[in-house]
């Protein structure tokens, strides 16, 4: 009996010890679980903070913001941040480069210029950049569009400056061929558009538009652009090029861009650099006269002769300004019209001293509001 009791008490002792040990382990396990949970919570909190910080960095990163500006708003890009520009001087190299680009299905735009670039030219480059992957800006002082007594030899040139400006505006390629490259010895072929070139600048500058049509046709053939961008300041030139493209079934879209003006209203032109301060002041009368014609139209005047006369009267007040022509014409055909029924363009050419300036304004009859 005593042995049995002893055996039971031993088992009871072990059980009690086991229970006590189990209790201790459970207590320790509980503490461990709590510690693990606390650590996990801390980790989660840190991760959450890190994620927020990362998100914040992604949204407000100056590097990413500046990238967006380059793509969406090229006008804000400084010259240092702009992409590089390639300079090509031969027709062979120009064609080779564009063949490589077309294998990547890239859209090509052309901006033809004679150089000495100003903001008017650069606005064309920026528009081309918006519409195409590759922007080719040509700088070529075309001898074919200058008359014998005109300013070919003294026309302003600054190729290095033009290159910097084009790079900042987003042009991809500067195409600057020499005259001997573009018109080699023995050159005998010319392109001439009739009809729209008969009057105005075509009458006062014989051969001018033949030179324009020839150089533009050659550029289109060399570069084969998807689109070409021209300014509306040379309005007769723009109409001539559109007629050239239409008549010869050239596969290129012509984009016309509004005239860019100085603060005083003078249309930007490379030839403005010829003007003295006094002449510059008198030259602003051209745009004042054009605006006067627009006001007269808005006030009810429809007679084309009266609209032209109001421009002439204002221009004749300037001592050094000699009027070459003022005409109210159809926007498509450039035919003079007796009255403005819907739309028209007023064309002006004048000399201020020795400098010939052109400008224009588009008129549109205001629609009457229905009552």
Predicted feature residues:
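Nucleotidyltransferase catalytic core that binds NTPs
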Residues: 2-8, 14, 22-25, 31, ...
